[in-house]
Amino acid sequence: MSPISNFARIALACTVAALLGGCVIAGDVRPYPAMAPIQPIMPPQAEPTAGAIYAAGPTLQLYSDRRARDVGDLLTITLLENTTAQTSANTATNKESNLSLGTPSILGAPVTLGGKDILSATAKGARDFTGKGNSAQSNRLQGSVTVTVIQRLPNGNLVVQGQKNLRLNQGDELVQVQGIVRPGDISQDNTIPSSRVAEARIVYGGRGPVAQSNAMGWLSRFFNSGLTPF
């Protein structure tokens, strides 16, 4: 066997191995999108007026609790998210066509050749299509994330943002939370459930072997995409 044939076989084997590896190897599943840290925008502090009895300054509440109300305060959001979605679609089409041309006649006599009709024709056609799809998804997320008040809106609502990074064994876990909360919904222990957060964006993701094992390879994604003609 010639060296060229051996090289061609080795190259073909390497190509097939790479394609098969694409079915099982995938890159890291990264959270969407990476949230850059934002420093709280502190409101300008008024300078005290020398010689006056009253001097403007930060709010001092003698009898209030420690609930978040100003920029830079911390707030704990309790994550209690449960979502369930299910969809089903069925499509069926059927079309039939029939065409029949009878034997023409001349002066009342049919046109034949050897006693057989030569100008008559019959055509039939039928098309059927059936499609069916089902999708079901259920998600549950529980935990807590302490966020920072980054802005106080004119109506008193608070814009909050925060994230939590965990490194467990060989994987990284990331939880990001952004949204708007109403001070009246904050409990006395300075916590609020995630269901009370408006414009909420809650992201949970990870990187590592566990995330890779749940990701589909690029070749598998191709055969499950709309690019395939099947």
Swiss-Prot record:
GO terms for biological process: bacterial-type flagellum-dependent cell motility. A lipid is attached at C23 (N-palmitoyl cysteine). A lipid is attached at C23 (S-diacylglycerol cysteine). Residues 1-22 form the signal peptide. GO terms for cellular component: bacterial-type flagellum basal body, distal rod, L ring; cell outer membrane. The keyword Lipoprotein applies. It is found in: Cell outer membrane; Bacterial flagellum basal body. It is a lipid-anchor. Assembles around the rod to form the L-ring and probably protects the motor/basal body from shearing forces during rotation. Belongs to the FlgH family. NCBIfam families: PRK00249.1-4. The basal body constitutes a major portion of the flagellar organelle and consists of four rings (L,P,S, and M) mounted on a central rod. This is Flagellar L-ring protein. It comes from Stenotrophomonas maltophilia (strain K279a).
